[in-house]
């Protein structure tokens, strides 16, 4: 079994565990914010921080493979980057987040989740219409 398949199966197993655990634990985010989940940061900072790997890391990873991408792969990459530039750097400043906070643990969890997502997407990008 390839490393990619092991990674995929592991990621699916983690998703199943988290899916069922969220029936018993309410993530302290938004209206469910509560004490006991560590220090809070501003919601805007937390959002930009947790979504930033989707832009920054993808640009770093894509820089090494840009010349080998075909037109369709380049379009998918451009769509990804357009979506996440908006989601990361534009949307948080258009919505009213004044005075709202989120636990740093949630922002860190999402940050690492997005690192995995970007890495996985980057690994599969060359297989799209290759």
Predicted feature locations:
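Membrane-helix and juxtamembrane interface regions of eukaryotic multi-pass membrane proteins
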Residues: 1-86, 90-108
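Functionally constrained cores in energy, signaling, and assembly domains
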Residues: 94, 114, 129
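Hydrophobic alpha-helical transmembrane segments in multi-pass integral membrane proteins
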Residues: 114-123
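Single conserved hydrophobic/aromatic residue that forms the stacking wall/gate
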Residues: 122-130
């Amino acid at each position: 079994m390839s490393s990619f398949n092991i990674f995929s199966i592991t990621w699916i197993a983690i998703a199943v565990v988290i899916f069922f655990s969220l029936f018993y634990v309410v993530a302290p985010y938004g209206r469910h914010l509560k004490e006991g989940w560590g220090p809070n940061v501003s919601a805007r900072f937390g959002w930009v921080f947790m979504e930033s790997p989707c832009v920054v890391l993808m640009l770093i990873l894509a820089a090494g493979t840009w010349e080998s991408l075909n037109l369709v792969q380049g379009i998918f990459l451009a769509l990804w980057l357009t979506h996440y530039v908006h989601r990361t750097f534009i949307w948080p400043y258009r919505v009213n987040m004044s005075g709202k906070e989120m636990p740093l643990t949630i922002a860190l969890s999402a940050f690492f989740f997005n690192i995995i997502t970007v890495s996985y997407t980057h690994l599969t990008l060359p297989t799209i219409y290759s």
